[in-house]
């Protein structure tokens, strides 16, 4: 939610620090810096949590984020904001630790459901965060940063009281811990056998960057949406996505199994993309949102497939690798999809959705292969 809080006002804050013509460039650079730091540090935090436990890593990250947001709230010069975003990328790379906590605390038959709940929480944060950030931004461009600091501080206190250690095999060995920040490019032996599934994970995350980067532009160009309609569509997507991940993923995985649930999600998302490409009226998008939300059940199922193939003492490394792949897609995806959109919009601006749907076909031969469980 902290990221969602500051996104609406970050350009406004930049206008206080740099000339107007430089705002867009610095805005893009700050987003890329945040994502790149998560690419590097998500596996580091995951490995640290394997070695020392989930709780201390999570607490340190929450405390660091609270201090960092408060510093950014009072950033007097541009370089302080850059340092702040760099630190935010590091302290915000705790998705791997949270996912590892779920893997520690659940059995193989219920992990997909709990990963779905986690995805729903992210979705809820990305609905409430921008809405609250926009309102606070009307008071001051600095107010959302203060709110983000307070929320992280509150989360730190809650975690101190409520969060119990879930990783039982850490600490007390006296052995040095070897951290591999670039584990994404040199996989641990225990993860190397899952390289094909990692490729599927990356492709699906990459496809997800199409709506993330082009939803507003496409709505304005194709349907002449105004700001209010764009906001309504984003809220509707976030709400339906959260509902499907929270309440559909678990029962569907129990009924179909993780692999078939993943295939169902891919098919739903691809169908939604194709329909979106050919939609001619803005109202058509809203029923299509149900297909896109149904597509969201695939990712928790894939996370469960991967988690079930890794031993308990490698869950942090696994989740760190997945988080790095997610953040790598958030760097590459917007660049690729926006370039494709710019190149084809003059002829027909639906090509980006057709390409996104077609990318799913790459995953099908990989998913036909058998994968062991509980390696």
Q: What are these model-derived regions, one by one?
A:
Residues 156-162, 354-375:
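Multi-pass alpha-helical transporter architecture, strongest
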Residues 39-76:
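Conserved MFS/SLC helix-loop-helix module at the cytosolic interface between two early adjacent transmembrane helices
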Residues 42-53, 244-258, 341:
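Helix-to-loop junctions at the C-terminal end of transmembrane segments
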């Amino acid at each position: 939610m902290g990221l969602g809080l500051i996104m609406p006002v970050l350009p406004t804050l930049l206008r206080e620090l740099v000339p107007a013509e430089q705002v867009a460039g610095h805005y893009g650079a700050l987003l890329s810096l945040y994502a790149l730091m998560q690419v590097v540090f998500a596996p580091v935090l995951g490995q640290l949590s394997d070695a020392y436990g989930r709780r201390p890593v999570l607490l340190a990250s929450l405390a660091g984020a609270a201090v960092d947001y408060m510093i950014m709230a009072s950033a007097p010069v541009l370089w302080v904001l850059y340092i702040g975003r760099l630190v935010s990328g590091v302290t915000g790379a705790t998705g791997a630790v949270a996912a590892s906590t779920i893997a520690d605390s659940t059995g193989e038959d219920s992990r997909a459901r709990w990963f779905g709940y986690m995805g729903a929480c992210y979705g809820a944060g990305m609905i409430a965060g921008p809405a609250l950030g926009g309102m606070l931004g009307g008071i001051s461009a600095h107010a959302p940063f203060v709110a983000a600091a307070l929320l992280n501080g509150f989360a730190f206190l809650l975690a101190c009281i409520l969060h119990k250690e879930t990783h039982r095999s850490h600490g007390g060995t006296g052995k040095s811990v070897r951290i591999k920040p670039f584990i994404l490019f040199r996989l641990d032996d225990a993860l190397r056998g899952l390289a094909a599934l990692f490729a599927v994970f990356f492709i699906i995350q990459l496809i997800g960057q199409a709506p993330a980067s082009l939803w507003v532009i496409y709505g304005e160009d194709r349907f002449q949406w105004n700001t209010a309609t764009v906001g309504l569509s984003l809220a509707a997507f976030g709400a339906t996505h959260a509902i499907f991940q929270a309440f559909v993923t678990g029962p569907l995985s129990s009924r179909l199994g993780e692999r078939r649930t993943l295939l169902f999600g891919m098919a739903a998302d691809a169908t939604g993309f194709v329909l979106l490409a050919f939609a001619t009226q803005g109202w058509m998008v809203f029923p299509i949102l149900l297909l896109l939300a149904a597509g969201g059940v695939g990712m928790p199922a894939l996370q469960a497939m991967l988690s079930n193939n890794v031993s308990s003492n490698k869950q942090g490394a696994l989740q760190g690798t997945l988080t790095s792949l997610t953040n790598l897609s958030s760097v590459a995806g917007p660049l690729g999809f926006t370039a494709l959109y710019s190149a084809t919009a003059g002829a027909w601006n639906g090509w980006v959705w057709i390409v996104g749907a077609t990318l799913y076909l790459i995953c099908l031969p990989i998913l036909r292969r058998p994968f062991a469980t509980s390696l």
